[in-house]
A protein has these predicted regions:
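N-terminal and secondary-structure boundary signal
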Residues: 1-208
Length: 210
């Protein structure tokens, strides 16, 4: 996996093209829930581990955070096997706290976004490929909705049931505001069906390419 990530980043200049010495680097995985370990609801820990290694080798100071739909970032990380890896690399796990930020759109200039994400020197977005009942598919843009902390996330999901277009526009504005320097999608095993939480694992590579 580490070698695959290095090959992926090599044409872009490697991790050092995105991370400079001393940069604070948010690693933003999908930490949806602690409730279904093994069902591919979250970004796989080994991806975050390898990316964190590359960040540290580039001189960055990685930290790890999300605003899960259910529970705390630390609780979801613990349930899904993250803690030993994070402890080995001495990477702090942070809970997100909201603050109002202006966005490029007057319609959504009241968005509350994670202070931790907005204050990071670098954001590395690490989403999971999953089906999504409301949006069909969740990947890079939708993962940044995890930077909307607390009760506002539930409110926006209810709004999606009323107006999917407006919800999608809000997601775009959130992504533009967070503006991640790098997105690496976990497609080792996706999730299909009743996603993003109730689906089943799905291998994305066909047999002839395995």
């Amino acid at each position: 996996l580490r070698a695959s990530l290095e090959r992926l980043l090599e044409p872009l200049g490697g991790m050092s093209a995105f991370v400079k010495k001393g940069n604070s680097v948010l690693l933003k995985p999908n930490l949806l829930t602690a409730g279904r370990p093994g069902k591919e609801c979250i970004t796989r820990p080994e991806i975050v581990y390898c990316v964190a290694q590359l960040v540290k080798e580039a001189g960055g100071k990685p930290f790890f955070g999300d605003s899960p739909a259910f529970g705390s970032a630390r609780g979801v990380a613990k349930a899904n096997g993250y803690l030993p890896m994070m402890a080995e690399l001495d990477i702090p796990i942070v809970e997100f706290h909201g603050k109002g930020y202006e966005t490029a759109s007057d319609t959504f200039n009241h968005l509350r976004l994670s202070k931790e994400a907005m204050n990071a020197d670098v954001v590395i977005n690490l989403p999971k490929v999953k089906s999504h009942m409301q949006l069909t598919l969740t990947m890079g843009v939708k993962n940044l909705f995890g930077c909307v902390p607390g009760k506002m996330k539930a409110w926006w999901h209810m709004e999606a049931g009323k107006d999917e277009i407006r919800f999608g526009e809000m997601l775009v504005e959130t992504a533009r505001a967070i503006n991640p320097q790098l997105t690496i999608i976990d497609g080792i095993i996706g999730q299909e069906g009743n996603g993003p939480i109730g689906g089943e694992p799905r291998h994305l590579r066909s047999e002839e390419h395995t």
